[in-house]
Structures are given as C-alpha cells and as structure tokens.
UniProtKB/Swiss-Prot annotation:
Residues 379-413, 735-751 have a biased composition (Basic and acidic residues). It comes from Neosartorya fischeri (strain ATCC 1020 / DSM 3700 / CBS 544.65 / FGSC A1164 / JCM 1740 / NRRL 181 / WB 181) (Aspergillus fischerianus). Its main location: cytoplasm. Residues 1-26, 36-50 have a biased composition (Polar residues). The lineage of its organism: Eukaryota, Fungi, Dikarya, Ascomycota, Pezizomycotina. Keywords: Cytoplasm, mRNA processing, mRNA transport, Nucleus, Repeat, RNA-binding, Translation regulation, Transport. Residues 1-50, 371-413, 601-643, 725-751 are annotated as: Disordered. InterPro entries: Nucleotide-bd_a/b_plait_sf, PABP-dom, PABP_1234, PABP_HYD_C, PABP_RRM1, RBD_domain_sf, RRM2_I_PABPs, RRM_dom. CDD domains: RRM1_I_PABPs, RRM2_I_PABPs, RRM3_I_PABPs, RRM4_I_PABPs. PANTHER family: RNA BINDING PROTEIN. One of its GO terms (cellular component) is cytoplasm. One of its GO terms (molecular function) is RNA binding. Binds the poly(A) tail of mRNA. Appears to be an important mediator of the multiple roles of the poly(A) tail in mRNA biogenesis, stability and translation. In the nucleus, involved in both mRNA cleavage and polyadenylation. Is also required for efficient mRNA export to the cytoplasm. Acts in concert with a poly(A)-specific nuclease (PAN) to affect poly(A) tail shortening, which may occur concomitantly with either nucleocytoplasmic mRNA transport or translational initiation. This is Polyadenylate-binding protein, cytoplasmic and nuclear. One of its GO terms (biological process) is mRNA transport.
Length: 751
C-alpha cells in the first residue's frame, strides 16, 4: 500500500545487536522509527536557517489538523499543519508536521509541548530533517535495553538529559501501549552519546540493571547475526527420555569437547520436559556433537540435536515453511481445479463427477453443503420423540437402551448431509482437461439452470481482483461524469490546514484555476472553491429552470467534486442499477413518456417505440427542440460512447464495452422479455436481475424457462418484502382516484 513520503527518520527499532529482538515497527508507520536516525543538529538553523518545521509523532489515528492547531497555536502563529495520511485509504499514519512563522516559536513548542497528551497518547516532537543522508546517520544515537515497564518517554528523557542536548527520545511500545523494555535516545553530538554510555551503562534504573550502547544499524546487526550462526556453540537437544539425569545428559556430550554448561529443562514439579541445552567452548565441538548425535537413538527415543535458535528465528523459519507449503499447494492445483456454480439441489458429489467425467481424469469432485444445525429436526430426533411417547404409555425399557439410542442418534446426526450451497469444485489431473471442461460446460443448461464454470481462485486473489475492478469502475464513472458535465478532471491534493491570515496557493502543475485566499480554519481539499458556494452555475443549467450564477448550494455539498454528483448519462450517483434500469427502460415501452426535464441521451432509449403521455414521441420520432425544464438542444455528452445494439449479445460483445454499459445492454435486452411476463413490475424485476453476474444474465437471455423461473423468484422476493414492509407500517392510505392510478404506478417504478 503506498504511503506519502515521510521526512522523518526511518531506521528500525529492533533490539540493538541482540538476536532476541523482533522488529517492533512495520513500515506502515514511519514515525515509529523516527528516534533511531535524525538530524545531528539541535536546531534547524544549521542546515535550514529559515525553517521552523516540527515533526510530531506518536499520534492517535483520529487526531486531525484542527486538534493540533488548537494545541500548537498557543505557542505562536502557526503557518500550516499537515497530518500525513495513506495515499490510498487516507487514514492517518500517526505523525504530522507543524510549521511556524519563526524559529523561536518552534523552539518554544519543542520545549513546552513535547510529550503532551493528545487523545490519551503522549506526542513526540522533534525538528523536521528533510535531508535523508543526515536522517540515516546513526551519529549520537544510543540504545538502552532492560528498562523497567514503568519508564516512559518523559522519564527516559529526564534521565539522559544531563549528558547533553537530546534531539529525540523514545521507549518502544507494543500495540497495547505497553513498554517493550528498550528504547532510544538521540543526542545532538557523539560526545554526549559517549558520555551517557560511560556513566549509565550497568547502572540500576528502577532496580533493574540496564545496558546502554551505541545503536547498531539493522544491516550491521544482520551481518553480525549471520556470523554468529556460522560459529555457534550452543546446542539444542530434544526427545530426551524423562529418566535421564543431569549427569547422564552431560556425559552424553563430554566426548565432543569442553562443555561450559549443560542443563535439562524441568517443570515446577522437577520432572524433565524432554529437552535441554549444551554449550561448548568452541564451535568445532558443537558442530561435531550435532553431526554425530542427531537422529541417534538413546533409551528407545531418537534424539534431535541442532543449533540453538532464538524465538524470532524459529518463528521466521516456521513462517517460511508455511509460505512455501502454501505456494506449493497453490501451484499444484493451478489450472486444474474448477469452480462450478448454479448447481441444483439434487446434484451431489457423484452426479457432479458424472457431469465432468467425459473431459478427463477427475481426482476429486465435491459439492459444498450447509452444516446441520442443532435446531433442525432429523429422522433420528423424531425416533427419539416417538420412543419417549412409548415410554409414557407404559412400555418398560432398561436405562442402557435409551442411552445407546441417544448415542446412535448423535452419530447419525453428524453424518446427515446439509442442503447444497449450489456450488462445488472439480479437480482434473491436467490443465488441458480442465480448460476443455471450462469451454464445454460453461453456460451449459443442467436441470434447467445454466452452469457457471471457471478456474478456482484463492480468496485473497478474488478479493484483490474485486477491489481492483471496483476501483477501475469507480474511476470510469468519475471520468464519464466529469466529461458529461464538461468539467476538468479533479486534482487529488492532500488536505492542508492553514491558520488565520495564511495565503493559499495553487499546487504546481494545476492549471485553469484562480488562486484565492482560504478563510481561517478552512481545510483545502479542492482548489478553486470556497465553503458553501460553487464558483459558477451547475453544468448544463445556463438559463431555463436551472440555478443562476453564483447560486448558493447547501453546506453539506462543501468539498464534494461536482463530477461526483452525477453518474454516466447525467444520472445521480445515488441511484444504483435497479433505479437506473427504471429510468432507462421504464419510459419506453408501455406508452409512457420520458422523464420530465431529462433529455433522452445516447444509450437511454427504451426497447419499445411508441408515444408517451400527451402524445409526445418517445422513440422513433424527432427529439423535442425545447420545452419547459429542458434545454433546446441536447448535444451528446463529451466522452460518451454509443451503446452497441443488444441483439445477439455474446460474452465477446460485452467485453468490448465498459462495465456500466455492459449492464445497460443486458438490461435493454432483458426488459422486453420481463415486461411480457410482468408488465407492472418489469422495471423493478429488471433492476433486481441486473445484480447477477453477466454470464448468468446471458444464459437467461437464451433460455426462456430459466428466465421465467428467475422472474418468479424475484417476484416472490418482492412480494415478501412488500408484505414485511406493510406489517411494520401504519394502516394503508385510502384508495386513490382512478385518474391518479397511472401516476401511482409510475412513482412505484421510480422508487
């Protein structure tokens, strides 16, 4: 996931030179690692004489620019504040930059506001250093470990402030805010760091002896760790018989060389836990012990002898093994495992195998089913109830028989297969067989339903593809909406908070806008606008019944791009596919006129040709050349594409057009067929069916029986919805006059 560039230090916070350390900070939060490398200067005057920029880290994700402005404006005049956010999700990264007009205010804020609680978390303030070379130098950076849990950032700062000027100070914390027992102090000079190491290393802090040393970069630690692995002396042994004593355990390995320590791990009761450690004085002795004793059988148990590993090492190895096994499994079934959907309830594993057996060797075939819940009544439970009734009637039974019948009933209940979920998987022995099955079986009618057959995908792959398709679809909609409105593409600029009296500016690269001075407390989101007012009239409404120039718009429209207010074809974005279907198809056939005030654009023609109310031609006749609430001429929108004819729709035809037009073409083809069956609810049912996959909709166009079944199913769902809605509402209104019946039906279709 991409993130905005941080100007804070970015070294890692792992324990200094110790293998047991784990990486406490992921790269998703650059401010977490800011302590380890920073500017070697105490003030920005050395490299940036006119800079008064502060880095503010350890922020709660909910902290906003306004909250920071309220805090930092108490020191002096704030030039600007920016909370850094992820470029995609726009979530806060946990750090921000505060710019003052003069350096003195920045120094005072650094002194007075450092470690101030913001939403329950102490913030960490330091000078912003924009030079990456200076940020990455570890000069003056000190690492402290074995800290007491009660020592926080401020306590650590107060302890080490006596040895020199501190640029930044931090105690590493977990996700719950608890101390990890180590921290970092970054001094202005290397002399101050050496002085702190000399005086504090080995001292007691809160009755705990601390280690203080120079910070070692991750690269250097990694090379040192690899060297330690190659020259190990500590050996781990497991599968040890519990009867083996400490003396016997030591004698097993004395023949390989001098032993500095040998111990068996025991529980609280003193019993052996079956493993132990032996530390040799030399690496050669340890290597010889591993080579000879590994897999050797002692007292009936085969020993495991290997290099002793730290916990994080073992976790990393297990993670790599799991990842390798997952990739191997995925590659094994890549291209041979098929996903089959739209199965009828009577299709089981055997029938599924029979359907696909002509295409090759099947290694497995399975139909996914629901699990039987405890509340469902099975045949075994019915038998138990009848047995209880017989007992009440006076039949004598022993106590063992009911228990046996209950146990048998439980076993039988576990074996009962649940209802089919309508999909399954078929695995072939080769990719060629699988591809042949996809070609032949996809969209084939089985028991009156068209099958959907495709290569099976993992859940994470499907999710990523779905997210990518949704993002692409939204981008296309925004571009079409902007083109239809005749507006330039929106410029995505991060929000910047300007203080009172600060001059705004147009970002570099943006053209066509007019600079303006933002109002105090204004968040700049879209250049060229101001709160509560749009710079000009809405597009497409010069004159007529549209809004006049500089017309005020409601405050809740502030900061919303005008291109986002309309979808393709001028349809508001608040309307989904069902509503679009009613607008597009509900005004053609059946003698209804077009929507008042909305010109009939390209791709908006209904499937029928007739006259609307009042004799106005709907399709097949000339367009109206003006009228109330309608422009005199409706030129085709810029960037709009003509929707191809819907006759003889195929998958290739659909793939040649954007996704929104695919649904439009399918809707235009489905509407006349559905109207022939349900004239009153054709628009609603069309919208409901458009939620299905395009491949299934193509199958419905070819199969009248399957379409009729889907229409009946949609009608039953709609009736159930109206029934439930009617039960929860107030009593129905009185019957409306006959002359309003047509208008009522129209409003229902629009809802």
């Amino acid at each position: 996931m991409s993130a905005e560039v941080s100007t804070t230090p970015a070294a890692d916070n792992t324990v200094n030179g110790t293998p047991e350390a784990t990486n406490p900070a992921a790269t998703s939060a650059p401010e977490v690692t800011a302590v380890e490398s920073a500017s070697p200067s105490a003030t920005p005057s050395a490299n940036q004489p006119h800079s008064a920029s502060l880095y503010v880290g350890e922020l709660d994700p909910s902290v906003t620019e306004a909250m920071l402005y309220e805090l930092f404006s108490s020191i002096g005049q704030v030039a600007s504040i920016r909370v850094c956010r992820d470029a995609v999700t726009r979530r806060s990264l946990g750090y921000a930059y505060v710019n003052y007009n003069n350096t003195a205010d920045g120094e005072r804020a650094l002194e007075d506001l450092n470690y101030t609680l913001i939403k329950g978390k102490p913030c960490r303030i330091m000078w912003s250093q924009r030079d990456p070379a200076l940020r990455k130098t570890g000069q003056g950076n000190v690492f402290i470990k074995n800290l007491d849990a009660a020592i926080d950032n401020k306590a650590l700062h107060d302890t080490f402030a006596a040895f020199g000027n501190i640029l930044s100070c931090k105690v590493a914390q977990d996700e719950f805010g608890n101390s990890k027992g180590y921290g970092f102090v970054h001094y202005e000079t290397a002399e101050a760091a050496n002085n702190a190491i000399k005086h504090v290393n080995g001292m007691l802090l809160n009755d705990k002896k601390v280690f203080v040393g120079h910070h070692i970069s991750k690269k250097d630690r990694q090379s040192k760790f690899e060297e330690m692995k190659a020259n190990f002396t500590n050996v781990y042994i497991k599968n040890i018989d519990q009867e083996v004593t400490d003396e016997e355990f030591r004698k097993m390995f004395e023949k390989f060389g001098e032993i500095t320590s040998a111990t068996l791990s025991r529980d609280q009761e003193g019993k052996s836990r079956g493993f132990g450690f032996v530390n040799f004085s030399t690496h050669d002795s340890a290597q010889a012990a591993v080579d000879e004793m590994n897999d050797k059988e002692i007292k009936g148990q085969k020993l495991y002898v290997g290099r002793a590993q730290k916990k994080h090492e073992r976790e990393e190895e297990l993670r790599k093994q799991y990842e390798a096994a997952r990739l191997e499994k995925a590659s094994k079934y890549q291209g041979v495992n098929l996903y089959v959907k739209n199965l009828t309830d009577d299709v089981d594993d055997e029938k599924l195998r029979e359907l696909f057996s002509p295409f090759g060797t099947i290694t497995s075939a399975k139909v996914m089913r629901d699990t039987v819940t405890a509340g469902e009544t099975s045949e075994s439970e019915k038998e138990k109830e009848s047995n209880k009734e017989n007992e009440k009637e006076g039949e004598e039974k022993t106590e063992e028989k009911p228990k046996e019948s209950e146990e048998e009933a439980k076993k039988t209940e576990k074996k009962i297969l649940g209802k089919s979920k309508g999909f399954g998987f078929v695995c072939f022995s080769s990719p060629d067989e699988a591809s042949k099955a996809v070609t032949e079986m996809n969209q084939r009618m089985v028991n009156g339903k068209p099958l959907y057959v495709a290569l099976a995908q993992r859940k994470d792959v499907r999710r990523s593809q779905l997210e990518a398709s949704i993002q692409a679809r939204n981008t296309i909609r925004q571009q079409q909406a902007a083109a239809a409105a005749g507006m330039p593409q929106p410029y995505m600029q991060p929000a910047v908070f300007y203080g009172p009296g600060q001059q705004g500016f147009i970002p570099a690269g943006q053209r066509g806008g007019m600079p303006f001075a933002p109002q105090p407390g204004m968040v700049m989101g879209i250049p060229g606008g101001r709160p509560g007012q749009y710079p000009g009239p809405f597009p497409g409404q010069q004159g007529g019944r549209g809004m006049g120039p500089n017309q005020q718009i409601p405050p809740n429209f502030q900061g919303i791009p005008m291109g986002a207010m309309q979808g393709p074809g001028g349809i508001p974005n608040g309307m989904g596919y069902p509503q679009m279907a009613q607008v597009q198809f509900g005004r053609g056939a059946g003698g209804r006129g077009q929507v008042p005030g909305m010109p009939m654009g390209q791709g908006m023609r209904g499937p029928g040709y007739g006259q609307g109310r009042g004799g106005a031609p709907v399709q097949g006749g000339p367009r109206p050349q003006g009228g109330r609430g309608q422009p005199a001429a409706a030129p085709p929108a810029a960037g709009r594409e003509e929707v191809p004819a819907t006759g003889g729709l195929t998958a290739q035809t659909l793939n040649a057009v954007p996704p929104p037009q695919q649904k439009q073409m399918l809707g235009e083809a489905l509407y006349p067929k559905i109207q022939a069956q349900q004239p009153e609810l054709a628009g609603k049912i069309t919208g409901m069916l458009l939620e299905m996959d395009n491949t299934e909709l193509l199958g419905l166009l070819e199969d009248e029986e399957a379409l009729r079944a889907k229409v009946d199913e949609a009608l039953s769902v709609y009736d159930e919805y109206m029934k439930n809605k009617g039960e929860g509402e107030a009593p129905a209104e009185p019957a409306k006059p006959k002359e309003d019946a047509a208008e009522t039906a129209t409003e229902e279709n629009k809802s």
